[in-house]
Amino acid sequence: MSVANSSHRAALLRVLLILLVAQNLARCQLTPAPVQICHSFHCFGEMCYQEAEFANQIAECEPEEHHCELIQLTTVHYMARCSPRCEGEIGTSYSPCLLANNSAPSPGPCSLQCCSGGPLCLVLSLGHLTIQEDKLVLTPPALVRNQAVQGVLCEGDSRQSRLLGLVRYRPERGVQEHALFLYNHRRMAITGDDVSLDQIVPVSRDFTLEEVFPDGELYILGSDVTVQLDTAELNLIFQLPFGSHTRTFLQEVARACPGFNPETPDPEFLWLSRYKCTEQKPSQRGWNSASGTWPECTRKGEDQPSIGGGGSWGGALLEAVQAGRSERCDEELEGADWEMSAAAGSRERDPAGGSQSDDLRPDGKGLLVDQSFRGQDKPDSLLTRQNKSKSEITDMVRSSTITVSDKAHILSMQKFGLRDTMVKSHLVQKEEDYTYIQNFRFFVGTYNVNGQSPKECLQPWLSHGIQAPDIYCVGFQELDLSKEAFFFHDTPKEEEWFKAVSESLHPDAKYAKVKLIRLVGIMLLLYVKQEHAAHISEVEAETVGTGIMGRMGNKGGVAIRFQFHNTSICVVNSHLAAHTEEYERRNQDYKDICSRMQFCQVDPSLPPLTISKHDVILWLGDLNYRIEELDVEKVKKLIEEKAFHTLYAYDQLKTQVAAKAIFEGFTEGELTFQPTYKYDAGSDEWDTSEKCRAPAWCDRILWKGKNITQLSYQSHMALKTSDHKPVSSVFDIGVKVINEELYRKTLEEIVRSLDKMENANIPSVSLSKREFFFQNVKYMQLQVESFTIHNGQVPCQFEFINKPDEESYCKQWLNANPSRGFLLPDSTIKIELELFVNKTTATKLNSGEDKIEDILVLHLDRGKDYFLSVSGNYLPSCFGSPIHTLCYLKEPILDLPLKAIRELTLMPLQTEDDGSQLKNHMDIPKELWMMVDYLYQNAIQQEDLFQQPGLRSEFEHIRDCLDTGTTDTLSASNHSVAEALLLFLESLPEPVICYSAYHNCLECSGNYTASKQVISTLPTFHKNVFDYLMKFLRELLKNSAKNHLDGNILASIFGSLLLRNPAGHQKLEIAEKKKAQEFIRQFLYNSP
Amino acid sequence: MAKKTYDLLFKLLLIGDSGVGKTCVLFRFSDDAFNTTFISTIGIDFKIKTVELQGKKIKLQIWDTAGQERFHTITTSYYRGAMGIMLVYDITNGKSFENISKWLRNIDEHANEDVERMLLGNKCDMDDKRVVPKGKGEQIAREHGIRFFETSAKANINIEKAFLTLAEDILRKTPVKEPNSENVDISSGGGVTGWKSKCC
């Protein structure tokens, strides 16, 4: 499990040149400078990076030199300078490894290139990887890189490092396929050809990559994520480094899976065929085979993205694996010079060639990843001092009680609703309600080890004379001064010191390692007492380099942030710039660390956390502030006199803090120990070297936050390995501990209050009335009932909605006005329910098939539904009643019981008067006779009869007279009666000329004999009515001199009333209308 | 702590004769309160409440329906989409108990086939006015293979338990899903469309 840090340890890349250029690029993007400034130096080996004063002169370039150039002349000889061109000096004997330009006025950043003629290249950046998709517009066609991560392939007991790269192929818009490329890589992989393709796993439908939890192993925070790759053919287990990087990668892969949507075509993976040759020749796997290339592949075609598949892709992956998420350069990857760099690469290799791995190298620095974890097998004297072995530590970590649950879900969890955010912010607000302060003991230690390996037991520093602390924060500087540590970010010292610390932790308690983070020589270790492990969460670690060119890792800081119970804690270990006079650089380094140190949050939608956003900050390290203005002898004398107070005044850190230049809000304990720098190694003697440095309190510990009590602050003279002495401080820190019961209660309250809020936000209105009774509804008489909707506090949209299986929200005779609308909070609207019975609805109401009864559903969008009940009684009328029914009604319709009307209305229409039914009937409806007779008596000479509209009020009177049989009281204008007659004919459910005879009539139109024949087939009552009406109309025509009526007018008026198209009220064609008129006309001019 | 606020949304429905206390049952569960004045529900009301079951946050959207007979044809249209239905009768009202079988038929006709049903005999605090013995409730529940509780919204007896049990039964039937599963609509919030979506 402690492979966890293999990402730091594994020899992944990092050529100085690449970095330099990248950093330069990144920096210049941040602050474009008018004048190009480049490093300019020749240097050899370690001198190049150890101390700025030995190399790395900064030069201002000539106006036409817009680029910085970095050249590796031999494996140890480097050169940097300004350059007028971006392309490098191709063709010269040495390899211009990388170049970059960055600023105006040159045309865009010229990519760096130490990579290949292929489309891809090592791109660089410090830190972790993220790839920007937008630069994927590169060749080859639509082949893009998405994500990559370095992991460990577990096969049985074997552990091999692999680079996993997710590659997307998008041949055309909307179509994409993915494959996972697995690469072997050489231990100190630098360029693309140190990487070789191991295999390609197409992301097919049966592809899964899932996090798994090995049986019996408990999940440890900060430990590797074990994932299982499954396809139909494969089953592989990988361990990926913990953190947001891996999380992103897994999410990307999950997103790449084709899913099971049958609509999308099965991926075909034809594009992978070009890599097939590498798969077919497993024996040639490995960087060292045939100088890292597969000729048969490279010659396949111009568009091949790689040398041997592994080369440039692998290079890109290398870059991907290490690329920083914070600073990135958008390099164009053209004009690359792969061949040359490949040559350079091969020169770098062991000339013996065949060596399989670097652990055989004579310098012995390159332990294989897996081997480096078995350090205790080596006959190392370190092991003899310990009281805990490495394996024991590991076991303890395993047995800690953190459960898998949360973090695992977070990996796949992206949705965070608004409600969630509110719950969280409420929880933060109410923190005091459910937490209490409990003191925990923190040990904070810092030690500049000057590149040495551990030679002494660290117990005097870490555990003597104290109680077992709850948390250990142990920082080192100058862990490894070697070239490899700097170039390749890889050092065996990490493991050595980790082990030395682990073995010297307090013997009274068991500790679990939470996290190890290292930037070159700056390392920070965080341990927690095993029983507290469950309360550590959200662990993130980051590094910031402030060294060479402001970015390199020879100086800078590393930090681990975590949540302990409910308190957020950030521990920073920094190694700031050296030299007495450079305090301003140190100040700047401090500020850079503060501003550039950013931790990803669990919720990716939240902005990254900075150091200052923590409840507790512990800052330790070789801050390198010196004692100034006093000569060496004076300092030593004051020290001898223990006159530390006098010395404080000259301590740069004290004066800079006092000047508020740095560490604002931080506290440092009183310095009661003598300066910790600089001693002759192995002794307590002050530096006797030529330089004879003045003693200084380089190594310091500061803190910021509430409830922090420093219990001790001291140096440890007993340790003599380094030219520094280690410093330690023990704190009691009040941590906010959650009272589970109160927490649950608080959470419950919050959830309740949110529920309450949500319920209160459901639109709700009050209605002034819900039951509506319409009394004595009459034919063609509008009745209106109104009510008001009073809205509550939520704006809402209301609408009457249809009931199931109904075509409108209410019955035909009803209408709501308005039927929909929008209401502001607390506003009111008046709704009118209009009831109007017309010819279409009257018959069923007469017959009782329909009633004045309805339920309206008033629906509020996102809210409740209200039911409104409508009821009432309808007064039957001759209007809307069938002719034959009326013929049987000897009494006025309103004098009859409803039941009788109902029966008569529903009585079927008889075509033959077989006389079997009621004998007691009239020949025509008396109501018709009443109206016609009235007109005959009063309006026979009336001008404009049937053409001038009547009065609505008079119609109601006429209707009432007819329905109550009180025609003797009828007093209305002739026009009103005429219109009532027309309405009567219009509202007949079966027209005078029955629907069934309609087409016959039209056909015989013009043939009077045939027409009469059709009329004779009508049911008796209908025939009677027709004859009666025709007789009346002929009477009218006799008076045409007075009333100005003519046959055409009457035929056109009565044609459409007596002859009605059975298809309903469709617009009649003119020809059809004409025929109907003609049909009637015949009867107006011919006597029967 | 950064958990989702809720993982699942369950739509529950309260049905039963008018006056058996459906609204009070809901009011007790959602607001932990009781109101003695009877206001007949004329329409469809709903409230939400978030509960936690088996580590999952579940949002219950509980629909309260009008019990009056004249609204039955309309209210049955709200059955569709309900994952759980609580059928409530009043232990002091024999008629409301007799109607149980009619309500059950309604459920069969109009609700989803796999809807989880539950029978509640409400007003169990009024033992002196009881006309439906507990055994009869248990028997009819057994016959139909559904759960039964006697509850009192007024005395807060078994209300929470009934809802949680119903939610648990639904949860048990709900296939284990990843949080992003689309089978469960977690995005609609309080969105209610009635049957409107069907027609227009």
Curated annotation (Swiss-Prot), chain B:
GO process annotations (BP): antigen processing and presentation; axonogenesis; cellular response to insulin stimulus; endoplasmic reticulum tubular network organization; endosomal transport; establishment of neuroblast polarity; establishment of protein localization to endoplasmic reticulum membrane; establishment of protein localization to membrane
Chain positions of cross-link Glycyl lysine isopeptide (Lys-Gly) (interchain with G-Cter in ubiquitin): 102, 136, 154
Record PTM N6-acetyllysine, positions in chain: 102
Complex and partners: Interacts with MYO5A; mediates the transport to the plasma membrane of SLC2A4/GLUT4 storage vesicles. Interacts with GDI1 and with GDI2; negatively regulates RAB10 association with membranes and activation. Interacts (GDP-bound form) with LLGL1; the interaction is direct and promotes RAB10 association with membranes and activation through competition with the Rab inhibitor GDI1. Interacts with EXOC4; probably associates with the exocyst.
Gene name as annotated: RAB10
Keyword set includes NADP: no
Gene source species: Homo sapiens (Human)
Lipid attachment points (S-geranylgeranyl cysteine): 199-200
Domain notes: Switch 1, switch 2 and the interswitch regions are characteristic of Rab GTPases and mediate the interactions with Rab downstream effectors. The switch regions undergo conformational changes upon nucleotide binding which drives interaction with specific sets of effector proteins, with most effectors only binding to GTP-bound Rab.
InterPro entries: P-loop_NTPase, Small_GTP-bd, Small_GTPase, Small_GTPase_Rab
Name of the featured protein: Ras-related protein Rab-10
Cofactor requirements of the protein: Mg(2+)
